[in-house]
Amino acid sequence: MELVEEHITPVSPYNFGLALGYLRTSSSAILEHISGDRYLRAIRVGDHPVVVDITFSGPIDQTTLHVKVAGERLNDDTIRTVLTWVCRVFSLEVNPAPFHALYKRDPVFGILINNYRNVRPILIADPYEAMLWTILGQQVHTRVARRMKWSLVRLCGHPLEYDGKELWLLPTPRDIANMDPSDIERIGISKQKANTIVRVSYLVSTGTLDFKELGGLEPESVYQALTRIKGIGPWTAECVMMRGLGFDDVIPAGDVGLQHIVGRFYGLGRKATESELRQIAEKWRPWRGWAAFLWWFQLQTEAYVQQIASGEKE
């Protein structure tokens, strides 16, 4: 296995340690391996598996990410693809100053901006993965969703070993498209979700659903294209647009967790309705997706603190 090391300097300020903290508690971080201040992830570049191994050094205003790429027959195109992927997933090249300025419009949200000032949205590795995880997360607790995601990976994913650790590659769209939905049901996934996963995987494997093409369209067009697929509703579409395609100004306002925390922070005495959440979120334009990320980070932090206090383990 060949190994190449490169370095990335994010737009400052940036706290990669805080980003790793998010991933440690995220129900969407299934294939990521976080150990101390080190990030490991196996991905595919074309048909070739590679391992992305990231550490960091320096203060938040001068952070450097040290990116090792491990794989067979590495070339310049592969390395460039991986570095672009890292910058995209961690939003490293986006100037956060306009987002931080939202505190002037909304002092309540400004509390979160201050708490998580030096981290930016972390995307799910690719839109297809975001679609799978979001479908499995429909109307279930995050712990249940996490177990289902792991079960799917172990059913039809691909393990590889790196530095003494077992990493897993996401199943390809073709892997899942060729499965009988009943096989997916046997690992504890509902019939409806199993059918949707196979359906979406078939559309992606045949090129009928092209996420690269969707990424270049206007948000409303993407939303309409996704919600035309059976089993994909508004919440799923907006989560995929935000977490998978990286639309900065899309917020999944139907998310119950967001509704609860916004209702609490804004003194409603109850969870916000979807309409109320969208109205409050008008103050966060054109960064509503970034705002949703911080609210989710706050929810994860609160849940983690509660879990530690009660002595629970994942």
Which residues fall in each region the model found?
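HhH-family (HhH-GPD) DNA N-glycosylase catalytic core used in base-excision repair
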Residues: M1-E314
